[in-house]
Amino acid sequence: IDGMPVGVMDLFDTQDMPTRLNSAIFADRQAHQDAACVYAMRTHGAAIIGKTATTEFGLATPPGTRNPYDYARSPGGASSGSAAAVGARMLPTALGAQAMGSLVQPSGYCANYAFKPSFGAINRGGGHFPCPSATHVGVHSGTLRDAWELCWFLSRTAGPDAGHTAIAGSPQPAEARKPHRLVRMFTPGWELTPQS
């Protein structure tokens, strides 16, 4: 974590940058302390590069974020700013959150890895989420190793939410193994997909 450049989704408080929730009514909102996971990263040497755009309140009005691979296509949902920054290789990793598909959908659209740990495995304190009873804190990353190591670190350092358990296992991800077999499944609509 020490020296790692990190982006922070604009739903997490940062003491040195405004937390606007992508809403005009919070244009001047400044938190007095970092969110728990931001504090953990900062105190262990991460370089908080800036805030990444989100949908308004993490819900509706999309930000001006563009898909780094095709400007005509969507970058995804609420964590799209984090996904686009990592997908464009501006950052190796960025903090995000998901209640429905806001981590995994943008990662698929912007060609990066998303890791969404179990609910409550990473402390949500200082995050402003539209659905706190369903929102998971997670990350976007350019590599599986960075995604796993950052989530594991946050879970162990910022701690889990009260009543929840931290991520188990080693701080390093398991080694990749060749699968016994692969399956390719064609779902309805596959034939409509351009072959290019």
What does each model-found stretch correspond to?
Residues 32-36, 80, 97, 107-110, ...:
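Conserved active-site and cofactor/substrate-binding residues in soluble primary-metabolism enzymes
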Residues 116-196:
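A short helix-breaking turn/cap at a secondary-structure junction
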Residues 1-100, 180:
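Gly/Ser-rich catalytic/binding loops embedded in alpha/beta enzyme cores
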Residues 19, 59-62, 104-109, 126-127, ...:
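Short acidic, glycine/serine/threonine-rich loops at helix termini
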Residues 56-58, 101-104, 136, 190-192:
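Flexible loop/turn segments at secondary-structure boundaries
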Residues 99-126:
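Glycine/threonine-rich beta-strand-loop-alpha-helix active-site module
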